[in-house]
Regions:
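Conserved non-cysteine loop/helix-boundary elements of the Radical SAM core domain that shape
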Residues: 1-2, 10-170
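A C-terminal junction/extension of Radical SAM enzymes
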Residues: 156-202
Length: 202
């Protein structure tokens, strides 16, 4: 508890990541209330979401408890690549509809590139579906095969990953998207989502 006259400590951001923290939405509100009573959060509150959990009801609850940024782990909008990653086929219509009804400062969507038989055209399609359906920020990370997991997925060579990343970068910049980091692009130059900062963050 803050004592009388004691100022709140200023931090840049508060992020809830890993897994599916939104499944504990009621407790999440309690945690945010407690933390904001001790800290002055200057650049917003973010949370990671699984696409199958994104509904209008959930987004409204997140907005009501003070969340300003969401990051949705899409990986791909295409079933053939979701299957490679061990994900079930996703029906994204509910998510798209919810994003049209509840607004956030940042709506980020995460993707994986350099999957078997994945082409630049596949990634181009994912990028445009994202930006056309509520996202104003995307992150595109290379697939990394951690040997101990025995995924059986044939990984791209480094030079192939670099070439694909260059195509992605050129495509995004040609369309006026702002490159925020090696893996991330924003639609309007202002949206951002990064759980790692150089400033104080929680």
């Amino acid at each position: 508890m803050l004592t009388e006259g004691q100022a709140k400590k200023e931090v840049s951001s508060l992020y809830f990541g890993g897994g599916t923290p939104a499944l504990a939405i009621d407790r999440l509100g309690e945690v945010i209330e407690l933390l904001t009573s001790h800290f002055e959060i200057t650049q917003g509150i973010g949370i990671e979401l699984h696409p199958s959990n994104v509904t209008e009801k959930l987004l409204q609850k997140l907005s009501d408890i003070g969340v300003t940024k969401i990051s949705i782990g899409i990986q791909s909008f295409q079933d053939k690549f979701l299957g490679i990653l061990g994900r079930k086929e996703n029906r994204f219509e509910t998510m798209f509809d919810a994003l049209q009804k509840v607004s956030f400062e940042t709506v980020a969507m995460d993707f994986i590139f350099a999957l078997p038989n994945q082409t630049f055209q596949d990634l181009q399609k994912d990028i445009e579906v994202a930006f056309s359906n509520g996202a104003n920020h995307i992150a595109i990370y290379p697939f990394i095969d951690f040997g101990f997991l025995e995924s059986g997925i044939q990984e791209f060579q480094k030079k192939e990953k670099r070439a694909l990343l260059k195509q992605i970068t050129d495509y995004c910049e040609e369309r006026g998207y702002t490159r925020d980091s090696i893996w991330t692009f924003s639609k309007d130059g202002r949206a951002s989502y990064s759980s790692m900062t150089r400033d104080n963050f929680l």
